[in-house]
């Protein structure tokens, strides 16, 4: 089963949509992240693995492939931890797949707690432009977004 979770990335100061596709398949157990990830994105495998266990779920003993699309754009930072976790849990049937109108950003600690990420304001503005109806971010980032002007206010 392939589960797609919406997220966002930054290219310079402009936000763009990233589709986080999570697939479980047979074969030797592995956890691969593809789609031009940087070192921090590749390290998300260990944070996600620990968070799955911390939330009381079993980590799948199968081949896990996470594709970050569009593959031609470099993905940087820890912003994809949360969408990878949600995609993995949905792919193995532990949670329902997220609604298509929702997007997710957030770094995971080894306990599964969310940590703030950088660049949420331009990503939130891109989310509004892309028609995202619900944007889920760590609490520390939500405070910043709540006190910032609406993307509609900045377009005038």
Regions inferred by a protein language model and the residue ranges of each:
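N-terminal low-complexity segments that are often proline-rich with Ser/Thr-Pro
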Residues: 154-156
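Peripheral, non-AAA+ core regions of ATP-driven protein-machinery
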Residues: 1-148, 152
């Amino acid at each position: 089963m392939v589960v797609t979770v919406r997220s966002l990335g930054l290219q310079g100061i402009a936000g763009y949509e990233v589709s986080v596709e999570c697939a479980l398949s047979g074969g030797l157990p592995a956890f691969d992240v593809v789609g031009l990830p940087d070192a921090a994105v590749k390290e998300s495998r260990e944070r996600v693995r620990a968070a799955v266990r911390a939330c009381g779920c079993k980590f799948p003993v199968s081949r896990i492939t996470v594709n970050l699309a569009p593959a031609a754009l470099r993905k940087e930072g820890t912003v994809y931890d949360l969408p990878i976790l949600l995609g993995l849990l949905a792919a193995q049937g532990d949670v329902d797949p997220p609604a298509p109108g929702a997007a997710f950003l957030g770094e995971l600690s080894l306990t599964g707690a969310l940590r703030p990420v950088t660049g949420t304001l331009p990503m939130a503005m891109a989310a509004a432009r892309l028609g995202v109806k619900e944007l889920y971010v760590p609490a520390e980032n939500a405070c910043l977004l709540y006190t910032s002007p609406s993307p509609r206010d900045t377009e005038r």
